[in-house]
């Protein structure tokens, strides 16, 4: 299924679920690095690798540092979809 604006939330949720090893029903717009125990350094690394693999890109260090919550991940995924 191609990624577009209609299924961006679905694809973002799949990335989060796999990287943070959480169930899809645990993913809400309130998801944040501070309120998700599995979002440790390894979870963050899995998330970055997942984004880079899915979109065949390399995130800049500033982008990696900016990934702190659902909205920031969604914004990055949205940007890659619309490039």
Where are the regions that the model predicts?
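Phosphopantetheine-dependent thiolation modules in NRPS/PKS and related acyl-activating systems
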Residues: 2-48, 53-83
